[in-house]
Amino acid sequence: MSFGQFIALASFVLSMGTIALTYAVGTAEGSAALCNPFFDGCTDITHTGMKGDAGFIFRGGMIAACSFFVIWWMVMRVWLAGSNRIALSVMQFFGVLAALGLLAGTAVLLPEKADTHWGVHVRGANLFFQGMLFALTINYVLIFRARKRGFVVPSFIFKTSLIAVLWFMFIGFAGVTVGVEMSHGKRIIEWWTTLFIGLYFLSSWWDWKGIQLSVNEASGK
């Protein structure tokens, strides 16, 4: 497994694995409603990871995942080093900003609603979804152009499908916005959008197979 593959896999497993484990623990402890949230929308992601052991798992796992998101964007920039430098900088800036927004929004979650800084959480979560969509879109455009120049992208069709679905949900459902209280429809969109973003991170597993990155390359030197 190359360094890049490890980052792609860890980004997906830490994020989606944490959410899955949190939900399992939350339902077992009775702090989260039991359903298929992807279709029923009985709960949002935030409220599955606030109380009890589920809260500790969620905060620890998602904060760790955010750190890997940041590294993922660094690796992606190195991989697309032949692309426009300004576009790469904008892509990385918004990707990292989105990850930091999620980190801040997760860090302020506390077991009791009254103790949680909801303003920080809501802004951080919305920054993640909207900033990440913008960064991933730039990333896809750069990959599309690089591929036309002969750049090999094994996951291109998969990435195309994910970007298309993400934009369909964003436009068709008036964007992905997180609030303290959300409708069933918004909750469903939140679950699916989170999954598709995670899968986009994972898709780089196939692109970065066999690619080894040195410390100097990863830092852009």
Task: Annotate the PLM regions.
Residues 1-16, 156-160:
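Alpha-helical transmembrane segments and their helix-start/interface "positive-inside/aromatic belt" motifs
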Residues 13-35:
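Alpha-helical transmembrane segments of multi-pass membrane proteins
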Residues 43-66:
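Interfacial helix-start motif at the membrane-water boundary
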Residues 58-71, 128-141, 193-207:
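Hydrophobic cores of alpha-helical transmembrane segments in multi-pass inner/ER membrane proteins
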Residues 78, 107-115, 172-182:
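Juxtamembrane "helix-exit" motif on the non-cytosolic side of transmembrane helices
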Residues 78-90, 145-156:
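Membrane-interface helix-boundary motifs at transmembrane edges
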Residues 98-152:
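Membrane-proximal helix-loop-helix units in multi-pass membrane proteins
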Residues 139-221:
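Terminal transmembrane helical module of multi-pass membrane proteins
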